[in-house]
Design a protein with these regions (language model features):
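Blade-level signature of beta-propeller repeat domains, shared across WD40, Kelch, NHL, RCC1
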Residues: 265-312
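A short loop-to-beta-strand structural motif that recurs across blades of beta-propeller domains
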Residues: 57, 61-66, 103-105, 147-149, ...
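Blade/loop signatures of beta-propeller domains
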Residues: 13-20, 59-63
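Short loop/turn segments that connect beta-strands within beta-propeller blades
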Residues: 68-72, 108-113, 152-157, 202-206, ...
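A short beta-strand motif characteristic of beta-propeller blades
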Residues: 22-27, 72-79, 114-121, 158-166, ...
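Beta-rich, blade/repeat-based domains predominating
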Residues: 30-41, 62, 80-95, 122-135, ...
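Conserved beta-strand positions in repeat-built beta-propeller and related beta-rich domains
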Residues: 30, 45-59, 96-103, 140-146, ...
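Hydrophobic alpha-helical segments and helix pairs
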Residues: 99-151
Length: 319
């Protein structure tokens, strides 16, 4: 996710000069500063801060997790004080792991009344952002300290202690498949530098980050296309989405058909041919059809049909 203070400066920017950002539909539901999406049981989980103001370090205890499925929204994890600023999520062996400020909170999906467990990270590692798992090890990115931690979760009831695993500039979104980790880099201080790119780590036992995509940005969410031939990456500056071909390395801007500009695309996910893009400051989730056709006139741009899940926010700061 991006950090407080940046959202409003980006609101007037468009993705690319020829983008046509128009809203095709708005569905009002129950979201409040949604940062992350995650496929779950035929639907999508959405993590919300629920706070009075947009603050990724808030300690208000108003965070909650919604479950969107078949056009309906229900509450999976209520705002009961267990979460404050929930971000990246992971479901493994009947447990839901959720990033929060300086910690990871673990909920049992089988025993909903059970108290959640807390895995604390070392002091100062505040912006715990995203999670992936491989062979019983959980990997957690911390954007403000340039670290990715690893811990053993083979026994969910007795998780290991988080250990520093590798250093990557501003690690934000994580994506892991077949032992290869992809990392979206975001500048914690808001100042984009050459090393804020998309990285790949091909060997988890001997981690060595390599630049996969050279263009710097404020990258947040990262997800595979349904055919696993490309990556979708969200960017806060300029606000939008790009598609990176994993075979050629070519990056293509995706043209979203929106009327209200995308402001803060956070932790995206792909499920059943649709891309879910949480627009954090606007408290909404864009649902984008993944089927794209290359525009002959442009040669490099794609157009996406889309509709909006603009979840009800009574104090929407950008309304």
């Amino acid at each position: 996710m991006a950090f407080i203070g940046l959202a409003f400066t980006l609101s007037a920017q468009t993705l690319w000069a020829d983008s046509n950002l128009k809203v095709s539909e708005i569905i009002r539901q129950d979201l409040r500063f949604c940062e992350s999406t995650y496929p779950y049981d035929g639907g999508i989980l959405v993590a919300n801060f629920g706070s009075g103001q947009l603050d990724p370090l808030n300690a208000e205890g108003k965070g909650y997790i919604n479950w969107y499925k078949n056009g309906k929204v229900s509450t999976l994890i209520p705002a009961d004080g267990s979460l404050s600023a929930p971000k990246g999520m992971l479901v493994k062996d009947g447990y839901l792991y959720v990033c929060d400020v300086n910690r990871i909170v673990v909920f049992s999906l089988k025993e909903r009344t059970a108290r959640p467990r807390t895995i604390s990270l070392p002091e100062g590692n505040l912006f715990v952002n995203d999670l992936v798992e491989w062979n019983g090890s959980l990997y957690a990115s911390v954007t403000n300290t340039d670290r990715i931690f690893r811990l053993d979760i083979s026994d969910p009831m007795n998780p290991g202690t988080p250990q520093e695993w590798v250093t990557v500039p501003g690690p934000n979104g994580l994506l892991l498949d077949n032992g290869v980790l992809y990392v979206a880099s975001y500048p914690a201080d808001g100042n984009t530098r050459d090393h804020h790119v998309v990285y790949r780590i091909a060997d988890l036992e001997h981690p060595r980050p390599e630049k996969l995509f050279q263009t710097s940005g404020q990258y947040d969410g990262i997800a595979f296309s349904s055919d696993h031939k490309a990556l979708y990456v969200s960017n806060w500056n300029p606000a939008g989405l790009i598609r990176i071909d994993l075979q050629t390395g070519q990056a293509t801007p995706l043209v979203l058909d929106l009327e209200t500009p995308l402001v803060g695309p956070a932790d995206i996910s792909v499920s059943e041919g649709k891309i879910y893009i949480p627009d954090l400051p606007n408290s909404r989730v864009l649902v984008v059809e993944e089927s794209v056709q290359q525009q002959a006139a442009k040669g490099k741009n794609y157009r996406l049909s889309s509709h909006i899940l603009d979840y009800y926010c009574p104090l929407n700061i950008l309304s």
